[in-house]
Amino acid sequence: MKPSIILYKTLPDDLLHRLEAHFTVTQVPNLHPETVARHAQAFASAQGLLGASETVNRALLEKMPALRAASTISVGYDNVEVDALTARKIVLMHTPAVLTETVADTVMALMLATARRVVDVAERVKAGEWTESIGPAWFGVDVHHKTLGIVGMGRIGMALAQRAHFGFTMPVLYHARRRHQEAEDRFNARYCDLDTLLQEADFVCVILPLTAETRHLFGATQFARMKSSAIFINAGRGPVADENALIAALQNGEIYAAGLDVFEQEPLSVDSPLLNMSNVVAVPHIGSATHETRYNMMACAVDNLIDALQGKIEKNCVNPQAAG
């Protein structure tokens, strides 16, 4: 008899068939309490859980006594109570490698769009304001040869450093929990403390997960330390930056511009002051959002769950200690 799983994300037919070859699959639209109650028997017997974006917490786990593995279609897992899973000896699988290059492309796009004011001037053209040869009021700033500061030198940070170093001849600074010798060897990246990075970088790019330590790591003090010509890019998690402090820094001219893929509350409120600032490029958490990468993430998550329920957790496991 096949193990049973709960699927709370729509998958392409080929990936669904791959799951069904190994498991009895119950598809649900979400993990809301009313959904769990409606499918109580399926949740109670499920050994696997696969999906994205929904909260996985102790209350849900109480309804899933047979659960052995959860697989998230994401690299981040701040919506999952990992400690609760580990305490129950439930492994959590994620998809870190398949989105690296695509997210780095997004960060680079935000750097270019903010520096060259692409969104702002494109909207002005559409509004009929381009009536003569443009002057300084339409100009942006260069990206090439400027100093890039990366906060969080993981896979995505490395991919960004590669683009900046080889493609744009940018000196690279980085701050992370530990030094990254490969980044220093390949890209001549210089490790420094956060204050030094903030004071020297022309672009401050944040690629951090959300933890107790990183929440509001960037606040009024940090923005005040940045150059008035600096551009702030956040492509990690929204709450890593205090959004009110960022808004104030932009309004007061403490920094030049911001490119934001993530926000403290998502979707971003239509009343947010950020949406009225011509020096802000705000996009709806599109970091990995290409057809190719999202398919690859789903395929990876499917394979992760198949492997995990066969006891294979050598790669992509967040909490391997849970299997011990």
Curated annotation (Swiss-Prot):
GO cellular component: cytosol; plasma membrane
Keywords linked to the UniProt accession: Cytoplasm, NAD, NADP, Oxidoreductase
Main location as per UniProt: cytoplasm
Task performed by this protein: Catalyzes the NADPH-dependent reduction of glyoxylate and hydroxypyruvate into glycolate and glycerate, respectively.
Keyword Oxidoreductase: yes
Main EC class the enzyme belongs to: oxidoreductase
Organism: Salmonella gallinarum (strain 287/91 / NCTC 13346)
Localization (cell): Cytoplasm
Pfam families attached to this UniProt entry: 2-Hacid_dh (PF00389), 2-Hacid_dh_C (PF02826)
Protein name: Glyoxylate/hydroxypyruvate reductase B
GO MF entry, a single one: glyoxylate reductase (NADPH) activity
Annotated Gene3D superfamilies: NAD(P)-binding Rossmann-like Domain
Reaction it catalyzes: glycolate + NADP(+) = glyoxylate + NADPH + H(+); (R)-glycerate + NAD(+) = 3-hydroxypyruvate + NADH + H(+); (R)-glycerate + NADP(+) = 3-hydroxypyruvate + NADPH + H(+)
Recorded family membership: Belongs to the D-isomer specific 2-hydroxyacid dehydrogenase family. GhrB subfamily.
Subunit structure: Homodimer.
EC number: 1.1.1.79, 1.1.1.81
Active site: 237, 266, 285
PANTHER family from the UniProt entry: 2-HYDROXYACID DEHYDROGENASE-RELATED, GLYOXYLATE_HYDROXYPYRUVATE REDUCTASE B
